[in-house]
């Protein structure tokens, strides 16, 4: 399984996507909990 999509490995894309999703969800819940998310 050495097939890569262009120059970026698939596992790297998955890792970055996972971090971004977790970060966005964390920011959303933190903003909602602290009251800053009411303006979004």
Curated annotation (Swiss-Prot):
Stretches that traverse the bilayer: 8-28
Annotated Gene Ontology cellular component terms: chloroplast thylakoid membrane; photosystem II reaction center
Ribosomal protein in keyword set: no
Chief place of localization: plastid
NCBIfam families, A to Z: PRK02565.1
UniProt record similarity statement: Belongs to the PsbJ family.
Protein name: Photosystem II reaction center protein J
Organism: Anthoceros angustus (Hornwort)
Lineage: Eukaryota, Viridiplantae, Streptophyta, Embryophyta, Anthocerotophyta
